[in-house]
Amino acid sequence: MTTNSLLIIDFEFTMPDGKYSPQNFFPEIIEAGIVKSIDDEVVETFSSYVRPKKFPKLTKRCKSFLKITQKQVDEGMRFEDFIRKLNELDPEKNSTIITWGNMDMKVLKQNCMFNHIPFPFKGEMRDLSLEYKNFFGDRTLTGLWKAAEEYGDSGTGTHHKALDDALTAYKLFKLVEQDKQYLEKPKPPTIGERIDLTELLKRAT
């Protein structure tokens, strides 16, 4: 039996203090939040800090913006163990990967290349922020928590905490999918639905 497996993913990354500080900077994943859903049921959530390799020392801007400490990241899991966990969450390699924006998968691919580790996912990749923009006809992409507010809801937990953002994205995903179904063109009625055959037969007799 085919199952509908979703991984709703949010990462937080290292940030530079300025354009050239540190030199040759590229973002690395330092926090991950994942919601795994099978057939519309949440079966697992995952949250962890991840130790960056190339730029292990967090910048002041990064710590201030993400409300994260150097100690939390230093005690996080190794990138190799993190990828192992991603593989465990998608053993059949058929999960649909859902993110808010395209940066999460871009950074994951770049980090995998830097660490000489194969990219862990093979399923469909869906950018929910782009789907939201197209669905509502917005000209620009909307932030995750602003989109939640536009739906008359509030985000889950704390913004820029990876698991809280993943849970918020999952809530939004379900709301958008629900609205898409409402707007789908209904199937044309059959002749039996258009005509009450019982009444027709009564009149004939």
Swiss-Prot record:
Coiled coil: none annotated. Its EC number is 3.1.-.-. Pfam families: RNase_T (PF00929). Residues 6-173 form the Exonuclease domain. Binds 2 magnesium ions per subunit. GO terms for biological process: sporulation resulting in formation of a cellular spore. CDD domains: ERI-1_3'hExo_like (cd06133). Its cofactor is Mg(2+). PANTHER family: 3'-5' EXONUCLEASE ERI1-RELATED (PTHR23044), 3'-5' EXORIBONUCLEASE 1-RELATED (PTHR23044:SF61). This is Probable 3'-5' exonuclease KapD.
